């Protein structure tokens, strides 16, 4: 089970040897090269991008544009596609809902969503439906966690205008059949939105191969700072949509009566840019490019398999969709008859950090007939020590609650 160990690249984990961080699906830790790049920006280059002709403002703007190009190359976006920088994956999805869907959808139209979507990929569409009279159709996974393509063929039909789902399920790590769903949607002329947030650290999705119309992700789940998200879409599609935020930086000309907006992608980037976060994304991409991706994925898979084997030996524990056809580095579980927050609290006292709650996926929790669960998620810095620590801590939970 030996593989590349990148733990030495992460200062927080080095300074806190007792920490067993198994919450990377919530946010990854930041490697030293990212932190150093951000510090260099703040101490040598800090300026308000696009707000001045002096060196610092110009250099900051160049850093953003260079990161835009690097991001497009990283996800293999077609030359016809633009990269819009947002503050988060949530904002990216809201731009699509407000600027694409709201002006186009009408009563009788349908939006097809996976029940396993994050709230950020549900709530904006509910708003669109309230405003337009459109309705939502849901795709449900089978007992093992796999979306049924035959069911999707029935749900995705002539009245479908948008199909939106996660590449990797936030709560369970199950991998959705993105290419098949995209093909079904395009057969009926529907637009496809893919939330790639959970996929980015497990092998970068190839947007050109996916063929989707909109692809979104957040930087902080792939080693960058909080505060930067990405929206990738065809330039012509973005040009056909109105702006989302209005103000400085997204206009070419303003009079007392009217404004002339910049073209895409800049018309979606109103307000002062979070240049430091964008710089961190550039550094994170370069860090990801330096990794032995196949070895990293194999290592994470081995850790995941080792943990699952241990969890399945505990009679007082249940897992959710852990036997999906394909799953990437996330295991959802509960100690029977114990609230997930209580379990996570005790694990935390043992130095094991997992997420508990509904994982911003309440409809999915309802579908699973649970209120909440714990979620352990792996990344490149995890080792068998983390698996063993979680296993020991779960035995402690079992003793405390006298589980049999």
UniProtKB/Swiss-Prot annotation:
InterPro entries: Aminotrans_V_dom, Aminotrans_V_PyrdxlP_BS, Cys_dSase_SufS, PyrdxlP-dep_Trfase, PyrdxlP-dep_Trfase_major, PyrdxlP-dep_Trfase_small. One of its GO terms (molecular function) is cysteine desulfurase activity. Keywords: Pyridoxal phosphate, Transferase. The modification N6-(pyridoxal phosphate)lysine is found at residue 221. It catalyses: (sulfur carrier)-H + L-cysteine = (sulfur carrier)-SH + L-alanine. The active site is at 360 (cysteine persulfide intermediate). Its EC number is 2.8.1.7. The keyword Acyltransferase does not apply. GO terms for biological process: cysteine metabolic process. CDD domains: SufS_like. Pfam families: Aminotran_5. Disulfide bonds: none annotated. Its cofactor is pyridoxal 5'-phosphate. Belongs to the class-V pyridoxal-phosphate-dependent aminotransferase family. Csd subfamily. Catalyzes the removal of elemental sulfur and selenium atoms from L-cysteine, L-cystine, L-selenocysteine, and L-selenocystine to produce L-alanine. PANTHER family: CYSTEINE DESULFURASE, CYSTEINE DESULFURASE 1, CHLOROPLASTIC. This is Probable cysteine desulfurase.
